[in-house]
Structure formats: structure tokens, C-alpha cells
Amino acid sequence: MDTLRIAVNGVSYNEASEIYKPHADPFTGPITNLAPWNFAVLATLMFVITSLSLFENFTVMLATYKFKQLRQPLNYIIVNLSLADFLVSLTGGTISFLTNARGYFFLGNWACVLEGFAVTYFGIVAMWSLAVLSFERYFVICRPLGNVRLRGKHAALGLLFVWTFSFIWTIPPVFGWCSYTVSKIGTTCEPNWYSNNIWNHTYIITFFVTCFIMPLGMIIYCYGKLLQKLRKVSHDRLGNAKKPERQVSRMVVVMIVAYLVGWTPYAAFSIIVTACPTIYLDPRLAAAPAFFSKTAAVYNPVIYVFMNKQVSTQLNWGFWSRA
């Protein structure tokens, strides 16, 4: 298939000319072979996801700020995860809702770069936050350094690493190492997975190693060690003193699994189109993993509230005291 590559104000855009001839410029009009109702459905979906995410994650951050009992190293990391999810929805969710409501990326180049960078950056911050959470569980239960306890300053250093490291590996496309480009459906922006350029491929490979494989490897290692520890210690010896830690560990596992369920399809899709950039995919099919990944920002705070008795108790107390 004849493939046309277009650069619009620094944002690269690949399209199959046979399919998308009516609108070579993604900023001036929608894909004409898709009925308007497709974009209306996506706009409605993004409105619901964005609204729920903003409300839920703001509630988690507000509760942690209001109740001193929740200001613990573990909760600092979870609040950081909520902040990342909140910012993903505030930037990417809002822009995606507006562009789908219009049917094309009418906001122009600056918004494309903003959405592409923001969603990628905050998404990777969330991924690395889960990796730090898994390390916190490993540190607390396995005690690799003996009686050394994890304190607030240690959590702060971990979060500083998360934000700095994520920024280092998501900012390069803004300055020319790869690019943030309009997606096939024309209403969202993402890293340029479809590029044939070897230079761009070096970034994509580096990005996957540092922002997906490394944090996932850290999660697998920490929970592998954690399971070994729990198997060695009998239920009687673990006792009631360790019961809260086991509950928190289960909560973190559920959060990690839920996040991976949301983002793994998008990661797999990105690998496929990077390896086969000329592959033809229906725009709706190509967009599905990206839109599905945004649901991760909705269910993480729900898991946190319902599986953490301390948080649910404080929220219930706050609600009924106001009532």
C-alpha cells in the first residue's frame, strides 16, 4: 500500500493515502470514511472516564491531605499515583474529549505535542510509582536491610526519582528524537510508533526498555522475593501483627495487575506497529488500546479505597460527620 508521510509544524503524520486522501492535514478535518457517530461515542466515553478519574483521584489526594492518619510513606506513593492519574485525565482526557467532540484534532500542533507528552509522561510516572510501591512492600516485609525502616524522606527520594527519570525519557520527542504525532483516528496524539526512521526506532526501543521493561522487571523481582518470604514464614508465626501488611500487599498486587491490564494492550499494539510500520489497521481498531488504557486512571483509586480499610474508614467517618 502506498504510504504518505506528512510533517505538520514539526509533528510527523503517517497515513495510507488510499484511505485518507480527503484530509492529508490532520488538523483541518476528520477522517471522512468514519461516520460522525464514531467520534460521538469516543467523546462520550472520554467524558465519563475523565469525569470519574478527576473526581476519584482528587478525593484520594484530598483525604490524604485532610486526615493525618493517612500520611505514611506507603500512602505518599499512592497519592503520587493518584496525582499522575489526575494529570493524565486533566490534560489528555480533556483534550481527547474536545477533539473527539469535533471529530478531528482542531486544537493544532501545540495541543498535539502537549497531549502526547503529558499522557506519556504521567502514564510512565504511574508505572514507575507502582514499581516503587512494589519495592516498598518488599522493603517492609522482607527487611533486606535489617531494622532499617522506610520513612517519609525515603519515599520522597523515590518519588523524586520517578518524576525525574520519567521526564528524561519522555521529553526527547519534543526536541526531535522521535516525535509526538496524531494517531490513525485523528483525534489523539502519541509517540510516533509508525515511523520507518531508524533514528526514531532507537528512541522507541530505549523508551520501552526504560519505561516498561525496567519497572515491570522491578515489580516481578520484588513480588517474587515477597512470595518467597511469605512461604518461609508460617501463618502462626506471621500472626496478627503482619495481617495489615498482607492486606496492603494484596491491595498493591491488585493495583499493579489492574494497571497492566489497562496498559499492556497499548504496549503490545505499539510494539507491533513499530515492528511493522506499514501494517494497515482500521482507525477504530488502532485507537482501541489507547482509549482502553485511559481507564486505568479510574479503577486504581477505587481499588485503593475499597481494599484499604484505613482509607475507607476515614472517608466514611468524614462523610457521616458532615452529614
Curated annotation (Swiss-Prot):
UniProt KW keywords: Chromophore, Disulfide bond, G-protein coupled receptor, Glycoprotein, Membrane, Phosphoprotein, Photoreceptor protein, Receptor, Retinal protein, Sensory transduction, Transducer, Transmembrane, Transmembrane helix
The residues that cross the membrane are 39-63, 76-100, 116-135, 155-178, 203-230, 251-274, 283-307
Residues recorded as bearing N6-(retinylidene)lysine in the entry: 294
GO terms for MF: G protein-coupled receptor activity; photoreceptor activity
What's the name of the protein?
Vertebrate ancient opsin
Give the record's membrane topology. Answer: Multi-pass membrane protein
SUPFAM superfamilies named in the record: Family A G protein-coupled receptor-like
> What are the annotated disulfide bridges?
112-189
Source organism of this protein record: Salmo salar
Q: Which residues lie on this side of the membrane: Extracellular?
A: 1-38, 101-115, 179-202, 275-282
Localization in the cell: Membrane
Task: State the source organism's domain of life.
Answer: Eukaryota
